[in-house]
Amino acid sequence: VRMCDGSSAPICRSVSDDGYHFRKDRSFSFHLSARYTGASARDPKIVPDGSGLYHMFVTTSLAGEKKGCLAHLISEDAERWEEVEPIYVAPGRDEPECSDYLEKDGWYYLIFSLRGKGQYRYSRKPFSDWQTPDNPEIPCQSVPKQAVWNGRIIFAGYRGNGAYAGTMTFAEAFVGSDGQLCFRK
């Protein structure tokens, strides 16, 4: 939710018993701290880390620095969330949107859309030390999402054609020896 009146946007959730039909959980809601520009908080992404800890990434900005970022929160139960250092801080005001996350062959990938272009960062560590690749753009244009299917990394995004959504785009990614992704459309 992005708040047009400047008030802090709540982080909410929906729940499902079957993964198909969802209902709003009206008992769950929280706000980011004043460290962040609360009105722009949106696009939460939750990632389990294998040790029982959940990580949430939220699109926002650092209030004092006026830099876009992905706030990083952690939880042991997906109910109570604690803010830690942002997982990514953009070089300017643009906010990294619609984040995604991938582990493949011992490399970790943080995926997001910045200024309408899909981008990624990579690391040997799951939640820090992000490197910018030689070419950070994902050739799926906006809002790239990935899935590992039969061992293959498939990205889907869209070409907006002047509006939101539009033509769906796909690309397959391969992990290079240095961890950078190589793409084939």
Label for each model-derived stretch:
Residues 1-185:
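Carbohydrate-active catalytic/glycan-binding domains of CAZyme proteins
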